[in-house]
């Protein structure tokens, strides 16, 4: 059963301007160490790095919407991180307030599954998150 859906669309250039203005202060506040490492590995061009951050920013916004909280009520940017499963499929890893909210919205006898789609086509980045509950026996 679907517990929450969220989407976000962001202008990559806007993220680039925030990074130029605030640098590491912004990156440290919003992105996990794993997300920053992923962006560093894409350092072939500045455009790729900024697009990588923009997609992850959109994913966090979409996830916060799917959680039903937005970035408030104890859910913070670094509580949500984009990670890839062994087969490469992206998903969200939640900690802190985001994990607590996910646990609270998941019915007993079920486990939460977070499906994430992220994409970019300059100058836009988009993310779509679906949070579902799957039977613990099937998980």
Swiss-Prot record:
Its main location: cytoplasm. Mg(2+) binds at residues 8, 61. Its EC number is 2.7.8.7. InterPro entries: 4-PPantetheinyl_Trfase_dom (IPR008278), 4-PPantetheinyl_Trfase_dom_sf (IPR037143), ACPS (IPR002582), Ppantetheine-prot_Trfase_dom (IPR004568). Keywords: Cytoplasm, Fatty acid biosynthesis, Fatty acid metabolism, Lipid biosynthesis, Lipid metabolism, Magnesium, Metal-binding, Transferase. Its cofactor is Mg(2+). GO terms for molecular function: holo-[acyl-carrier-protein] synthase activity; magnesium ion binding. SUPFAM superfamilies: 4'-phosphopantetheinyl transferase. Pfam families: ACPS. GO terms for cellular component: cytoplasm. GO terms for biological process: fatty acid biosynthetic process. It catalyses: apo-[ACP] + CoA = holo-[ACP] + adenosine 3',5'-bisphosphate + H(+). It comes from the Bacteria. It is found in: Cytoplasm. Belongs to the P-Pant transferase superfamily. AcpS family. Transfers the 4'-phosphopantetheine moiety from coenzyme A to a Ser of acyl-carrier-protein. NCBIfam families: acpS (TIGR00516), pantethn_trn (TIGR00556). This is Holo-[acyl-carrier-protein] synthase. It comes from Rhodopseudomonas palustris (strain BisB18). The lineage of its organism: Bacteria, Pseudomonadati, Pseudomonadota, Alphaproteobacteria, Hyphomicrobiales.
